[in-house]
Amino acid sequence: MKKKIFTFLLFLFLSSCGYEAIYSLKNRANYAFQISKLELSGDRQVNLKMKQILSTYSNPNIAIEKRKIFELKISSDSEKITTTKNASGDATKFKNEITLKVQVSMDRTIISNFSVTEKFIYNNNSNTSELRSYENQIKNNLTEAAVDKVTSKLALIK
């Protein structure tokens, strides 16, 4: 009986916790901007992920007088740094760092320049294929976090 009550209460609390996906269409409507031109340079993997995410942020359904139309130039840099080594000189920890340098233009006039950096420290793995796969996953996650910060800053531009 206690198990059923606990399960019911758990379901009740979790179903009404107010969770909303960050990238839902409802939340994207709050971003009153459209990206008319996107120039990317730097790390290819980061640029592909950025292009995939930023292409969804053009919102033509917003009234034209309220919509800001931006042109973006983004330079990306990805760096893998060895942070810790063991006694024999082998790397035990790495730091993956992604930096985005963003130039925002509106009507061919530069209105903002800013930089976004995301970092993650992780342990080495003896299996190189697993390590490479994990590093790619980390790079994608860091890119998503950095692009989220970029879109938040774009939404705040008046």
Model-predicted segments: where are they?
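Sec-dependent signal peptide recognition
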Residues: 2-10
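Compositionally biased, intrinsically disordered linkers/stalks adjacent to structured regions
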Residues: 26, 135-158
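Short extracytoplasmic
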Residues: 41-55
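Solvent-exposed, flexible loop/coil residues
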Residues: 26-29, 37, 115, 125-126
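Surface-exposed short loop/turn segments
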Residues: 52, 56, 61-66, 71-115, ...
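N-terminal hydrophobic targeting signals that begin at the initiator methionine
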Residues: 1-2, 18
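Bacterial Sec signal peptide processing site at the extreme N-terminus
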Residues: 11-34
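Acidic/histidine-rich, surface-exposed loop or edge segments in extracytoplasmic proteins
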Residues: 30-41, 130
